[in-house]
């Protein structure tokens, strides 16, 4: 009889020998309900029902006993059910520790969790934790597993809640971080003795080592056999080990003072984020600091879902830096790469040249070439990298070679076109190569006197199966060819049928290639008949067409074309098109076949030719200059869809260049496919070396059926090698590399996929990584070991030896020459100084002039000053002020030559009449403009106040030998005039815009990556997406121009001595050409003028035009003007009305929210304090956390904190430091390098206060005082108009500086406008950029309205195209202010209005071209009162 479940339980208790330990009730009432057995997993699960909870001690004894009894048979678990759960809450507290042990938490965290307070309420268990972070972590990490553990023990629990005690949060935060991340001490005790010994020895070694950690090792060593690929991590796991290379690392300090590190690694199967908190009393931070991008690490930890980034991450317990075996070039004799593409190959190459050069050097290659597509923009960086790594750099380019004009007529015949007989024919073939493919259909029609008089149509049997591609293209099937005659029979019959007629074909070179090859194989020799190519003929006589395919031409000529790509139909269509073309030629005066090429040739013939790739290698310095000329001509003169190099251009500048055959797109490779060997060898003689590239790179040609198979490809290689051997030309193996390693190829795929029109999208991209010598030898093993070594190693090294050392970048500055520049600058400086200070110059003036002139003239900089002076003078003469930028205002010579308005001398008075002066040299006055008003004691005239106290050293350095960088702010509307004036000064061929290179930005790359993954149906975690984004970032995307930079070439050199030239973004309609090199590359070699466009001078000019006030006469210390920087009272409004505590809305430099807050904090009242504000706002770590705190705590006031870089030198010299040391300190601090021990000691010796030293140590970047002073001077002048001439100011502001308008709000009353502004403030964080720009305009409008002025609606009768105009106390906005209305339409409205009034909305749409949407907006604005939808017809109009 079967045992009951109670009996089973008793048997079990006896078997595991605990019967005597159990309570009698439990022993008698307990039930063993079932046992779940898994033989596969060797697990037994006992299901036991008890009448009550076992005492915790008994429970542990039971579990231990049952595990021991069956340990050799299975892994045992128990699942209890308790029928009477009385006192469940008490038992839960006792069982808590055991249940925690069943979770996946680390032992250390388990220990901490066991100390938490437990509260049981019904079926809910509450665990009291210290803070929100702890609560979130425990809830996520163990909630489910903890509930399961309690239920397995018999507890009836629905959920567990982790609750925080708010009072404990702050004090326990640091403890929490440790709990989550620290190593488990208990686990360490259970480790093997050997491991303990290793750790002890390592600890001892670290204790004895006082130097910084140079290799990361945290936690336990990780067993390599546990490593798994990152791509296999797809869900949360307790313990995982991985290896990867770091591609991003971020170390963040927490409020507790500890740090968290976030590392992104990849093993190139996938990527993962690793995280870890530093442990207390450990040197983890130093270990993390030893890590950097590019290092390999082995890491171990828990995989969990990060709720913030919503992705899997590893919370590390262990990490160690490892040495990963890198790719080696093990060949004894290394090769040289002659074909390589960098990130400058537009949207095609991946790494920068520096990465290639470093890798080549690491492999021991003696040299390396760079051959980007159509450009040489990598040359400067290539030179620097080669010098750094000690490797020979070979400079080159892969260009597009075209014949100067593809002929229309071949083998000219003396035949009158109207009398000739033509055979218009077409062939269908098994492929594109007449050498390796066969004709399957030959069709022709015979034409005479404009009519088709005969037809010829034959199939031929190729004796091979047609590919699916050919069947789909031609609609010819194998069945149609089975019984077809041999091609020999077809061609023999065809030749006889043709007679002496002129051949006509569309793309005749293709069709005639097959005919001539067939004739020659039959022993006929090539055809002697004349030929006309209708494709080239159309390109010449139909230049207005963008396409010239047969389909397109058939439509244009009205010819029916059915079943395109069947020979007979194509032939008939071509015949009818050609008949019409003959008439066109007659109208152009072309009457004879032998006149076609002569009379129809044109200068744009290069556009018609099909480009072939060609490699150009620089052999010497002359070759470099010639290459620069070729590149320039291809980009400027011969650009058509892509830069083109006419063969005649290459021939003209071939000296110093080695010409190679390039890739499968090269002329020679094409010839092997299309011509017999004698023709191939003839073409080969044009080149200096023949390239053959790895078969792997040509696999796509086989896939696309352009090459039949690998055997055919090998035959092509043999023919290329034979051509080289026959012509005595070296054959070299080149890699055509587009990236460094195989795993980088994905980035190129992504970039190519982002270009829908790129032909490379048609096929699978081959592996184009940078190959080692061994890899290249292996690629060409089919040639035999000796021949492979010859082309891979021997020939590449010999070719490299023929190339001289070439330097692409000059090593010194070449400035223009201007006769008498030294004398003119000296005379001009002294003349203006005497005009201002009198004939008897003060000694301080003489000393400063002489000091500066000695440096300026002695170092050859006078010409730079003179150029700047003439540019500024021209602008001033034309009525536009010029603002200076940068440190030029530090130069008193620049002031005296009127380059800048900033006077850098110490603050001083000057009498305009008797020239008496008084200088303040003790630092007591920050700016001369802040001196109190004073009259001359001699003559009683009001004294002029000047001087900003700026040392000259901040401009040209302490020795005065730094090349001056004079940046000038011209009016934006005058800037083109200033640019063009440089052509007057130097000549059109001596000035160019400074070129820039636009690369793929991170945000753009992210779009490319996401698009590619979506298209491919691939899901990747965020870390892998980040890696792919980094791979695509930095690749050249376009070119551009510096907004104001003009490069000046000296008259004794030409531009090609420095750089090629081009149009920005290849825009052939651009008014200026730019440098081909990024201007930074040649910054130290040629003079760069920064002629920038700025709104301030434009606004000043408009204010001057409106008011008639000369801006130079505006007082800089006007009290009401100064007041607006701390209160809006002088504007006649309150803070509440304009919602701002200052009156600086719209004042340059002081109108942004950030600077307005600075003004509220500091309440400046003087010009020097405004200069301080400008310096503080532009610096990095100068205000926030630095000067701001010093002012708030009362340690300093605004005038004494460090604001501009020059303040440091001036302050320290006044404190007693030597000028040279003061200068060194200033330079160190402004560059964010802090202070050396020597500097600190010197400053303390001169009693510089500690707060000053601390402030210096925090600064990362500082603004020049001269720049700040120039900005503030403009700002104060504009503010003057705002205070004293409001409508002039508002009209100018809205016209010049504003761009986004909400006119519907702007025409409302002041209360409505204020409410709108207030509402937008409340939603500020949710506003987009455009809305924020609108808000800026509405802030100004609100202020204007509360000052008693208002905005009218747009007026069809009065509004201008672009300018706000004043009418009474109102402004009338221009048409351009209407959202969505462009410049051209704005002008068109005004022009149409001048022709007469608009009669209706329909009339407005018709005359001005306004869209319905714009008309509706104007209607809503109230700008179209009484204007009907349509004009009413009057009797007088009839």
Curated annotation (Swiss-Prot):
Catalytic activities: DNA(n) + a 2'-deoxyribonucleoside 5'-triphosphate = DNA(n+1) + diphosphate
Instruction: Indicate what this protein is called per its UniProt record.
Output: DNA polymerase III PolC-type
**Coiled coil regions in record:** none
Matching SMART domains: EXOIII, POLIIIAc
- The keyword Nuclease is assigned to this record: yes
Q: What class of enzyme is it?
A: transferase
Q: Which family does it belong to?
A: Belongs to the DNA polymerase type-C family. PolC subfamily.
NCBIfam families attached here? dnaq, polC_Gram_pos, PRK00448.1
SUPFAM superfamilies associated with the record: PsbU/PolX domain-like (SSF81585), Ribonuclease H-like (SSF53098)
Q: Which GO terms describe its molecular function?
A: 3'-5' exonuclease activity; DNA binding; DNA-directed DNA polymerase activity
Cited function = Required for replicative DNA synthesis. This DNA polymerase also exhibits 3' to 5' exonuclease activity.
Q: Which organism's genome codes for this protein?
A: Staphylococcus aureus (strain bovine RF122 / ET3-1)
Cellular location(s) = Cytoplasm
So which residues are the signal peptide here? Answer: none
Presence of the UniProt keyword Cytoplasm in the record: yes
Where the record annotates domain Exonuclease, the positions are 422-578
EC number annotated for this UniProt entry = 2.7.7.7
Question: What biological-process terms (Gene Ontology) are attached?
Answer: DNA-templated DNA replication
Q: Which InterPro entries match?
A: DNA_pol3_alpha_NTPase_dom, DNA_pol3_finger, DNA_PolC-like_N_II, DNA_PolC-type_N_I, DnaE2/DnaE/PolC, DNAPol_HHH, DnaQ, Exonuclease_RNaseT/DNA_pol3
Q: Please provide the record's keywords in A-Z order.
A: Cytoplasm, DNA replication, DNA-directed DNA polymerase, Exonuclease, Hydrolase, Nuclease, Nucleotidyltransferase, Transferase
Q: Which Gene3D superfamilies match?
A: 1.10.150.870, 3.30.1900.20, 6.10.140.1510, Metal-dependent hydrolases (3.20.20.140), Nucleic acid-binding proteins (2.40.50.140), PolC, middle finger domain (1.10.150.700), Ribonuclease H-like superfamily/Ribonuclease H (3.30.420.10)
For this UniProt entry, which segments traverse the membrane?
A: none
Q: What are the record's GO terms for cellular component?
A: cytoplasm
Chief localization: cytoplasm
